[in-house]
Amino acid sequence: MADTLLKSTTRHVRLFTARVNEGRLVPDPNQLTLDLDPDNEFLWNDSCIQTVQQRFRELVEAHAGQPLNDYNLRRIGSELEGSIRQLLQAGQLSYNPDCRVLNYSMGLPRTPELL
C-alpha cells in the first residue's frame, strides 16, 4: 500500500507529509515539507524567510510524538499564518504589488497615512 500524502493549506502556507525528490512531492510519513506563500502575495527578504522557517522548526519540534494528522497539520499552518501576520504588522514583510491579485488578505498595509 502506498503512503498517503497529507496536506494542510492556508492562504500563505502549504504543509505536506512528503519530501521533495527531483521537483516532485514523494509521500513520506516522517517528514513535513513547507511551501511558503505559493501565490507570491508578499515580498520576502532572507530574514523573514528564516524567521518563518525557524518558527516552523519550533512547531514541528513541539508536536514531536503527536500523531501526524490533519488536525495537527492545520494547527502548525495556523500558527505559521500568525507569524506571517506579525511580520507584516511589524513592517518587516510587505505585500507584493505585482501579485496576481492584490487583496490585502492580512489587512491593509501599515503606512503613516493609514495609522
Curated annotation (Swiss-Prot):
The entry's keywords: Membrane, NAD, NADP, Plastoquinone, Quinone, Thylakoid, Translocase, Transport
Keyword Hydrolase: no
Localisation per UniProt entry: Cellular thylakoid membrane
A GO cellular component entry from the record: plasma membrane-derived thylakoid membrane
Membrane topology: Peripheral membrane protein
Catalysis: reaction(s): a plastoquinone + NADH + (n+1) H(+)(in) = a plastoquinol + NAD(+) + n H(+)(out); a plastoquinone + NADPH + (n+1) H(+)(in) = a plastoquinol + NADP(+) + n H(+)(out)
The protein's Enzyme Commission number: 7.1.1.-
GO terms assigned for molecular function: oxidoreductase activity, acting on NAD(P)H, quinone or similar compound as acceptor; quinone binding
Pfam families, A to Z: NdhM (PF10664)
The family this protein is said to belong to: Belongs to the complex I NdhM subunit family.
UniProt subunit comment: NDH-1 can be composed of about 15 different subunits; different subcomplexes with different compositions have been identified which probably have different functions.
PANTHER family per UniProt: NAD(P)H-QUINONE OXIDOREDUCTASE SUBUNIT M, CHLOROPLASTIC (PTHR36900:SF1)
Protein name, entry field: NAD(P)H-quinone oxidoreductase subunit M
Organism annotation: Synechococcus sp. (strain CC9311)
Organismal lineage: Bacteria, Bacillati, Cyanobacteriota, Cyanophyceae, Synechococcales
